[in-house]
Design a protein with these regions (language model features):
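A generic "structured core" feature
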Residues: 162, 180-182, 186
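Active-site/ligand-binding-proximal alpha/beta "capping" segment
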Residues: 174
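Conserved coupling/switch loop of ABC ATPases
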Residues: 171, 189
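Short, flexible, mixed-charge acidic loops at enzyme active sites
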Residues: 133-143
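Domain-scale signature associated with acetyltransferase and cell-envelope carbohydrate enzymes
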Residues: 1-129, 154, 158-160, 169, ...
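A short acidic, glycine-rich active-site loop
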Residues: 143-155
Length: 211
């Protein structure tokens, strides 16, 4: 082995041994979960008493509030995006208390998104108020990644809503209190309160309660 490389390797081994046995390493290992939780909480506008599982992805989390007692499971993505025309991020995502957001769920907004109390989602759910570009010929001639991201309408979800695995909530819709969204559904229009909906696009399967 090259003498210089050997010297570098020996130095690295000594440094690694020192760090592994140091008080700093032991402290970080003992407190890694607490430090991870605190790091994420400080990113958000509000996130007191929220449980974050591993590998949470955020963007501009200062525009996002998460209510007390909520739980974001592994690999949840939650992002707020700036207005590409003004350069200002005036997005506002509010998730009320008691939300339980399933693994790999993606919540994203450029405008205002309000999610009521006690939301329950399955895995791989998408909730979005935006899309890449529009359907004009000029935009369609661009690569999708180069089309300007724009909000298509605010999303509002009421209290005690249950959204099944792999459902997609598209821009501009309101979902009423107590609604149940079946797995694999695509929500393109408003959903009545206390109804069960499913399909692509969704239709009302059952009305559970008359308002």
């Amino acid at each position: 082995m090259n003498p210089i490389r050997k010297e570098i390797l020996n130095f690295y081994i000594k440094l690694n041994n020192w760090y592994t046995n140091s008080w700093l390493c032991k402290f970080l290992l003992r407190n890694k979960d607490y430090l991870y939780q605190e790091m994420l909480r400080r990113k958000f506008c509000q996130a007191e008493n929220v449980i974050f599982d591993s590998d949470i992805v955020t963007h501009d989390a200062h525009c996002i509030s998460i209510g007390q007692g909520s739980h974001l499971h592994h690999h949840v993505i939650i992002t707020a995006w700036r207005n590409h025309h003004t350069g200002i991020n005036d997005a506002n995502i509010v998730i009320e208390e008691g939300a339980d957001i399933g693994e790999y769920t993606h919540i994203t907004a450029m405008g205002h998104m309000h999610i009521g109390k006690n939301l329950l989602t399955g895995r791989w759910v998408t909730i979005t108020d935006n899309g890449h570009g529009d359907t004009s010929l000029i935009e369609l001639q661009k690569a999708p990644i180069n089309r300007v991201l724009s909000s298509k309408g605010n999303v509002t979800i009421g209290d005690n809503v249950w959204i099944g695995d792999k459902a997609t909530i598209l821009p501009g819709v309101t979902i009423g209190d107590g609604a149940v969204i079946a797995a694999n559904s695509v929500v393109t229009k408003d959903v009545p309160a206390y109804s069960v909906v499913g399909g692509n696009p969704v239709r009302v399967i059952k009305q559970l309660k008359t308002i």
